[in-house]
Amino acid sequence: MQVIQLQGNDKRLYELVAPLVMNPEVLRQNHNYPFRTTENFVWFIGMEKKNVIGFIPVEHKKKEYIINNYYVKDNKEETLKLLLEKVISETNADVNLTSVTFIEHRQVFKELGFSEEKVWTRYVKMKKDR
């Protein structure tokens, strides 16, 4: 898998992810929460050949990076792990990295150094230990 990074308003981003973010099956996996982007986002997109197999949009706010939703084809943990490793390596270690993580992926985040801060029914707020 190759991971590419695109700014939140990059034309290529829309070409790559539009078929997914408007797909009812992908939206269902995201609990019908819409994906959004602005110029403050960097998208980490996992590609296999010419196909998108996952993505993590990361919003850069003043004092933190935020992962608020993401998509991984077939819920493959290995894809999620590779995308997360890229996010961690490409974000400034001096800035907090937090995630609203699906309950079913909490262990992958823990393996990569995230700690739980708050648990809800479907999600866990997690913070990267830096």
Q: What residues fall within each predicted segment?
A:
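Active-site rim helix/loop that mediates acceptor-substrate recognition in acyltransferases
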Residues: 23-43, 47-48
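Conserved GNAT acetyl-CoA-binding A-motif
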Residues: 90-102
